[in-house]
Regions:
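Structured, helix-rich domain cores that form ligand/interaction pockets
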Residues: 1-220
Length: 220
């Protein structure tokens, strides 16, 4: 089975068995440029993101634990790869496919995503999300988790909250944010999104039950 099909089958089976509606929004793959970059370049033009651009600043906020020196974007797609700061790691990069679950603009095509995954033959982490037509009860989680608010460049606190320690292996973090406000959508729409590590895709296991326990509590 192909990687994307296997991921979707895993999540769809969980959704069917648990009356849930989880979706994939982002995929990340760490890779060796020596072995993969030439194949990626055959997919289209990769354009360097300007160092002082607001886009690069925004992208840096999305990458955990490591600094990045540069980023390259696949044409007009919401698909990038990052170069790492440390010299030994510069041979490696992280490719990210963003915006697979969107309402305000087209998502990357499934055909393109499949071609990328055929080249990479792996997935390092995914963002799994659920969208709600109301604001979740985030504070209900405060008795068990530390809720960290997001601060903008001016230091102002926003409605966005993070759980950076879920106490669950592979469930790296969870973010709650106003999706309608972020994307200029009409009405009320909030997103709960989990970043989940995948140590070994050949033995695919995602902590979806644990994520559901958290989303259920926020939906009460």
């Amino acid at each position: 089975m192909k990687i994307m099909q296997e991921l979707e089958a895993f999540i769809n089976e969980f959704n069917s068995s648990n009356d849930e509606a989880f979706s994939i929004d982002s995929i990340r793959i760490e890779f060796s440029k020596q072995h993969k970059l030439e194949e990626l370049k055959k997919l289209g033009n990769w354009n360097k993101v300007e160092k002082n651009s607001s886009l690069l600043s925004k992208l840096k906020k999305r990458l955990q634990k490591r600094e990045i020196t540069s980023a390259w974007r696949l044409e007009k797609e919401n698909i990038y790869y990052y170069n790492m700061q440390d010299a030994p790691q510069y041979r490696k990069a992280t490719l990210v496919i963003f915006g697979m679950k969107q309402y305000h603009k087209p998502s990357p095509s499934k055909d393109l995503i499949s071609k990328i995954l055929q080249i990479m033959k792996d997935v390092s982490s995914v963002d799994i999300c659920i969208d709600l037509p109301y604001k979740p009860n985030i504070e209900a989680l405060a008795t068990r988790y530390i809720l960290t608010p997001y601060r903008n460049s001016n230091g102002a606190v926003s409605d966005t909250k993070y759980i950076n320690d879920t106490f669950v292996p592979m469930l790296d973090k969870i973010v709650f944010y106003n999706k309608a406000f972020k994307n200029g959508l009409q009405g009320t729409l909030w997103r709960i999104e989990a970043t989940i590590s995948i140590p070994n895709f050949r033995a695919l296991a995602l902590p979806l039950h644990e994520f559901k326990q958290i989303t259920d509590q926020a939906r009460r």
